[in-house]
Amino acid sequence: INRAREHAVYSAIESLGISETVHYFDPVTGIKIASYLTDAHVCDSGNWEEVTKCIAALREFHSSKLHVAHSFDLWERLDFYESLWKGEPSIYADYDKTKRAVLSLKRFIDEQPKSIQLCHIDAVPDNFLFVHDTNGAEQIKLIDWEYAGMQDPHLDVAMFIIYAMYDREEAEKLIDLYFIDGCDKLTRMKVHCYIAVSGLVWSNWCEFKRHCGVEFGAYAQRQYDYARE
């Protein structure tokens, strides 16, 4: 994690009030002091009323079209996490085939129109917190901005889907929630491509963590399945 970049992101979003209130952030060590959010709960990905509110908050954040000096390169991360295996083979017998299929999506993704802007990248249900202000009004806070950078905001939609481990029907429902004015065929295809690529990115990350003795079980398998299927 590049803490200087994370610090830049918190500076960029400060005026939005969408994150926790940060009082101190050391861009070298990453030490952060923030106000504690009391009586908070994370988004329940199976509760579509909560999901709808979170996606609306994500869409509102995207509407700000903020910029920072760094980007999140999906393809670079794919190779980087694989490089952390130190030459060890994947636990998946068809990994090479799956990776080739995922890489073949790059041309299509690159050809699609995009509005490159600050994206959260880790916009998953667990990072949306439901809290209440001093008057008791419900608020949604989006936390954990360490991966945030310049990207296509539609990638954030894909990230929510794969962390929630949605099936195809649920994924389509989530896409429709985000695109309130309708989603054209090519954009929908692009989101599904992001689902596949992101699935392999986080699968590779899970394989690295496995080498470190940390197992992610069903989550790791599901990420690979998004890439493969």
Identify the meaning behind each predicted range:
Residues 118, 141-144:
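Pre-DFG segment of protein kinase catalytic domains
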Residues 27-29, 133-137:
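Short strand-connecting beta-turns/loops that link adjacent beta-strands
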Residues 221-229:
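Amphipathic, Lys/Arg-enriched alpha-helical patches that create a basic surface
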Residues 154-183, 196-214, 226:
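Active-site activation/catalytic loop segments of kinase-like enzymes and analogous catalytic loops
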Residues 3, 189, 193-197:
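Start-of-helix signal in alpha-solenoid helical-repeat scaffolds, especially tetratricopeptide repeats
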Residues 66-121, 125, 131-133, 176:
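An alpha-helical support segment within catalytic cores of ATP-dependent transferases
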Residues 1-75, 85, 89-97:
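ATP-binding pocket architecture of kinase catalytic cores
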